[in-house]
């Protein structure tokens, strides 16, 4: 049994969940998180002042899977979550 964690873009959650279901993952924990990396944040205007928002909203998924499902689970997450743009991760 292995615990797999991935941080993905929020709009990819449904696709990842469906892909994991197809490979046999039956349980998943989802947490809303914020993070930053090479992908830069954005500026927002609040009460007439500009603020830089460095942390971007992400979703962390966690799943405990049997050893025989580890590779298929990772492949399913990567394939479903990838957008081809900055912020995809490694």
Over which residues does each language-model region extend?
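Positively charged, small/polar-rich N-terminal and surface patches that mediate targeting and assembly
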Residues: 1-90
């Amino acid at each position: 049994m292995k615990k797999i964690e991935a941080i993905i873009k929020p709009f990819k959650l449904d696709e990842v969940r469906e892909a994991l279901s197809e490979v046999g993952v039956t349980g998943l924990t989802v947490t809303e998180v914020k993070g930053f990396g090479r992908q830069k944040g954005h500026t927002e205007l609040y009460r007439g002042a500009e603020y830089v928002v460095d942390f971007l909203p992400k979703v962390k998924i966690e799943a405990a899977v049997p050893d025989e499902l580890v590779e298929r689970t990772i492949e399913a997450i990567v394939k479903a979550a990838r957008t081809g743009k900055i912020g995809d991760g490694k």
